[in-house]
């Protein structure tokens, strides 16, 4: 098969409506030729020509058959990877809104011809995004769902909107020379699949620790060639290596991109750009090695439009318009760090890794946590803990105990897990975690809040890209392939598992997920009273004097948050009368995008007048009175996880209870995050709690929980009773 025909086939597989008719068109050619040869038996010359060309035709057919088989297998692996990463309808709609389908102009259907149809090489069309309308075409169930496909005409003419933003993922591949060929191929395959889904990739190849600059440049070039070859070997993959794209004035400073278009041209052609960490001096044109983190920062600044040169005398409005145009041209959606050390480990509290990091709230705390862990390596530790902690730092804890943190534990809690004496390798690993954390903090600050980052291992990405039969041994049994972390993240903009999900809910089937950390610039978190100063308790003076009329609280926005989340009007005065005087605290995420109101409730068996007696204070029930998230923030951005984690890990780690209607669709989310649940007979309420030892070790506490959940009266303006 000619190179041109190969390119045609590779291109046509991206348009499923074309691929669906490909076998019929291709095999119609041999049948037509056979009929013509039979008709030509009357002419000896034609018969002789047929005898010479028939073996060539059979050889050509066999070659094309093998090519189609390879393409079919590649498509099968791609669709399987996509389906195993499939998400909810809400998340699919969000993905389609971020990656809109290419505009289509429908043509009237034409009847299929019975005569021979030659396979003519069409003009190759470069798509700036992904056309999910045709992508989901062959699946019948999805075909009937308007979310994934609009219209039913199979033959369409595509018009490309070149003004659509180019979605880009900046990828850092760390210590590439330590990775085997199989891992490199798996990473290349995943990057190719991301390209098919509309996410162009620009990869910075870090060769790893090298002694001198000359060896560094040589190793960087070798590893870039290695990755490029692996990408080109993938079905439909195209790599473009760039060696001379960076310049800098002097050593030590962050380089700059020579030309913006040098990056954009191959990206718009669906090529995966591979950048070597080498910069040239503007004065001497001498090449020098550059830290890969500095390259990532330089690329981020360039693609974000921050390196645009403007005339100081230019009208500020013109400058703003030009800057806005640059930002609309490119959308840096993902920052991906593929590092053998994996996600960021946690050394405080019971969690073993940070699965989701709200940078606005947690960056300083996690950075300090890692620095303190490095400092503690110099102290004495029980050697029995060495193997456990080595796994925690080196592989970011690939064990079944999986939990992340949104809000770090308070100083009053236990500080650090013991660390091993042998800290050479450990120290290096933790330093790598600190550098990765700082890199994503610096780059996410330059990007819109919608951008996100993810840290994971190349091995995990490679394994999830491989077919399941290649992963399982003969003695193993599996029903489905592992979820491709990067594809799942592209579709959902979330970690593979909710960060507020307790480790007990995950079982032993998700060890690889703890090797990843999902990061967003996020939002600030306001907690009243501040548990870092005064822990929440019934006898806390801060809690006793806190009311919703506090000047630190924007009551009108809080009421709007509650009414928008519950889709009901609140009787504000009645609600204030009920909760003021018994508030435990308030948690607000961002600009009132989410929040929780918690109270200390008195069990009905205790008279209200005796509520504050010292002997009754331990029996006051920590109660989640309102948990609300704006509709526009529900299911996105991790707002609910941030608030919930603050509640159960920072404010009330000893436990909290709440109730929910039996028909509330959020109950599954509650159920997964609670230690227990109980249906309240004779009502439409279900009770949840996170308190350890209830009811096995504390039956009185359980009875108090149930009594409080039964006795709370709603404060809605419609005055509906509890049975609503």
Curated annotation (Swiss-Prot):
Residues 1-27 form a transit peptide. It comes from the Eukaryota. GO terms for molecular function: L-glutamate N-acetyltransferase activity. The keyword Thylakoid does not apply. Its main location: mitochondrion. The keyword Amino-acid biosynthesis applies. Keywords: Acyltransferase, Amino-acid biosynthesis, Mitochondrion, Transferase, Transit peptide. One of its GO terms (cellular component) is mitochondrial matrix. InterPro entries: AceGlu_kinase-like_sf (IPR036393), GlcNAc_Synth_fun (IPR011190), Vertebrate-like_GNAT_dom (IPR006855). Residues 47-58 have a biased composition (Polar residues). It is an enzyme of class 2 (transferase). It catalyses: L-glutamate + acetyl-CoA = N-acetyl-L-glutamate + CoA + H(+). Residues 37-70 are annotated as: Disordered. Belongs to the acetyltransferase family. This is Amino-acid acetyltransferase, mitochondrial. It comes from Talaromyces marneffei (strain ATCC 18224 / CBS 334.59 / QM 7333).
